[in-house]
């Protein structure tokens, strides 16, 4: 039984203490990562031994015993490396043989050689046990099949699957590269409130909380837009924020109620400038990660070679559904939606337009800028300079998904107030996603906001694309899952369902 495993491990740890060995030492002097060692010594010939000494640490993932010696693999953030331990070379070989198993976290020190089969290996001279886990590791070949367990116990997923660590390293690299790119462009990274008195900047249902100190209800932000624009009013030319956004909506393979976005705003720019910036940024990321402008996502080649396709929302919907979202009546649009199995409120033209787009969005595979959204669904965007029925707005669509959203930002306070009032009318009609009236934002605009281009990109969806991940929860380290209830620290039922092996001996192979 797995409960017996835990009890045996606790007993073993007590025995270590009785031997004067601290089973949880305070630190370890690690000179190299596994990646450092492999890069530094990749030039060695097969069988070549150096006199260079290294020390590294990590979790033992496998052990192969050979009489009075053993090979084992250590895993850290950067990968795995082989270590070789021999009775005649290692000070505490007997301790290793008797006490160390797969899953233990250890530190090793020794010289480096390349095995006869060409694998960089550490010949261990000194060895230290750093942690002995109380729980067994996932079985090597079967691992965890239950996705809910993977998401809930991501730490186990990371231990078992090297690809998981690689994916989250890439996420970190992508965010770092975005920051580096924008810094070189002269953008300042700023911070805006997560707790807000009003929500704005997007059409979404917010999470509500209560601030005891002031005895008022507050909201978790659904966007950073309105506060970032206040920076532009105040005199910043270029600002951005990378942070968490919260929307009390559904969960799907491409939606998550808590997600990460970047919004940026540039004074004296418009949506054409934002299109160019978006192309440049994402192409830069693709080239930095893959050395090319073409990647494969879910078996489909995606080509980021510039310039990207540009198409008007009106034209694309008319081409695919035969309805004109600018000229046709509400009744005509409602009829087309009904023919496609979508029932809507005929009094909400903006909602009908969004539903029509939903029907055709997945037809767009290659990077495409969808342009000129109607005013009804773009309350914060400037009206188009040549056609006031639409706005200077674009969405970037890749593989049937919105990746970015951008405007020539509305900076006319009278027009902005009028659009806010229209949003209030929609709220009165029951649309809980319509935007609230932010009077302070209107007041800020009355002080004067220069012509401004704004851009928002969903970081999680971007990481999905760049890591070939099918589900948004695969790129969020600790996504939302159903609560599992009270956890009995000695209960392994959740792990038994996930095919965790029952015997320690099965690991030592």
UniProtKB/Swiss-Prot annotation:
Pfam families: tRNA-synt_2 (PF00152), tRNA_anti-codon (PF01336). Mg(2+) 2 binds at residue 402. SUPFAM superfamilies: Class II aaRS and biotin synthetases, Nucleic acid-binding proteins. InterPro entries: Aa-tRNA-synt_II, aa-tRNA-synth_II, aa-tRNA-synth_II/BPL/LPL, Lys-tRNA-ligase_II, Lys-tRNA-ligase_II_bac/euk, Lys-tRNA-ligase_II_N, Lys-tRNA-synth_II_C, NA-bd_OB-fold. PROSITE patterns: AA_TRNA_LIGASE_II. One of its GO terms (biological process) is lysyl-tRNA aminoacylation. GO terms for molecular function: ATP binding; lysine-tRNA ligase activity; magnesium ion binding; tRNA binding. Its main location: cytoplasm. GO terms for cellular component: cytosol. Mg(2+) 1 binds at residues 395, 402. Homodimer. This is Lysine--tRNA ligase. It comes from Fervidobacterium nodosum (strain ATCC 35602 / DSM 5306 / Rt17-B1).
